[in-house]
Amino acid sequence: GYAENMAKAAAKNLPLFLSSTMLYRRETQYIKQQVAEFGKPVHYIYHIGQYLPDWHPWENYKNFFVGNARTGGVREIFGIDLPWLLDTFGDVTHVTVQEDSISDLGLPYPDCVTLLLRHASGAQGVLAADVVSPKAVRNFECFGDGLHLFWEGNPKALYEFKDGDKRFVNTYASFEHDSRYSDNIVENAYVDE
């Protein structure tokens, strides 16, 4: 468990941290750079979801960590995505939470959670995470007076609206993808991490 891993890391004088794969995605790095260069408060809307039985179709979702209330699928999504959001928009100063269960998955935790986040930078965001979306989705939109970014979660779908045009932003010369997973899972970030 956690205590055992922490003890092993301490014995070897190694840091122990949650996966921060999204910090290594070139799309999130680009978004962070653009927000920093913009220099004014922005708002964002971010929806991440995927039907839980499709996460690992080769095994029953109730038999691995996402079926457990303590380590469930929605918590996993937050654990993956909050690090890059905090890195990009700053610490959260206020949060409002709405939870719901709208599926027949029989989970011991809410299958849909929506957060309204206020960041120290002045940014405000809506973060919706779910384990019921029939299609795996990672849709992000960030906007301010003079900035508008769109990202559909994969390397072929990052855009910025500039001078009246929606323009593709190419952040990868090439990328690795395992066909067993959704198109928003890119192996490059795992290697970089």
Predicted regions and their residues:
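Rossmann-like NAD(P)(H) cofactor-binding subdomain of soluble oxidoreductases
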Residues: G1, F17-Y24
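Short catalytic-loop micro-motif centered on adjacent basic/acidic residues
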Residues: L16-S19, V126-A128
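Contiguous beta-strand/loop segments that form the cofactor/metal-binding neighborhood of enzyme cores
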Residues: I77-A157
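Predominantly a Rossmann-like dinucleotide-binding segment in NAD(P)-dependent oxidoreductases
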Residues: M22-Q98, S103-G106
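C-terminal glycine/acidic-rich active-site capping loop/insertion
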Residues: D145-E193
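Short aromatic-enriched loop/helix-cap "lid" or pocket-rim segments at secondary-structure transitions
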Residues: T28-Y30, P53-N60, L107-P110, R138-F140, ...
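Rossmann-fold NAD(P)-binding glycine/threonine-rich loop
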Residues: Y2-P15
